Amino acid sequence: MKTQFVILIVAVVLLQLISHSEAFLGALWNVAKSVFGKRGLRNFDDLDDTFEPEMSEADLKYLQDLLR
C-alpha cells in the first residue's frame, strides 16, 4: 500500500511538472510567433519610408496624416 501511494504521488508530481512546462513552452512559442510572424514584422516596416532621403516635407506630412 505504501508503494502504491508513493508511485501515485510521484506520478502526480511528474504530471504537474509536464503540464507547467508545456504551458511555459506554449507561452514562449506565442511570443516568438508574435515577434517573427507577419503581423509582428509588419509593425517594424511602417517607419522605413519616413527615413528615405528622397522624400520631401510634403510627403512626410502626408504619410504622418495617413498613419494617424
Swiss-Prot record:
The modification Phenylalanine amide is found at residue 36. Changing residue 35 to Y: Decrease in antibacterial activity against the antibiotic-resistant bacterium S.aureus, and no change in absence of antibacterial activity against both antibiotic-resistant bacteria E.cloacae and P.aeruginosa, as well as no change in hemolytic activity. The keyword Membrane applies. Changing residue 24 to G: Decrease in antibacterial activity against the antibiotic-resistant bacterium S.aureus, and no change in absence of antibacterial activity against both antibiotic-resistant bacteria E.cloacae and P.aeruginosa, as well as in decrease in hemolytic activity. Changing residue 26 to K: No change or increase in antibacterial and antifungal activities, and increase in hemolytic activity. Increase in antibacterial, antifungal and hemolytic activities. It is found in: Secreted; Target cell membrane. Residues 1-23 form the signal peptide. Changing residue 30 to K: Increase in antibacterial and antifungal activities on almost all strains tested, and increase in hemolytic activity. Increase in antibacterial, antifungal and hemolytic activities. The keyword Signal applies. Changing residue 30 to R: Decrease in antibacterial activity against the antibiotic-resistant bacterium S.aureus, and important increase in antibacterial activity against both antibiotic-resistant bacteria E.cloacae and P.aeruginosa, as well as in increase in hemolytic activity. This is Amphipathic peptide VmCT1.
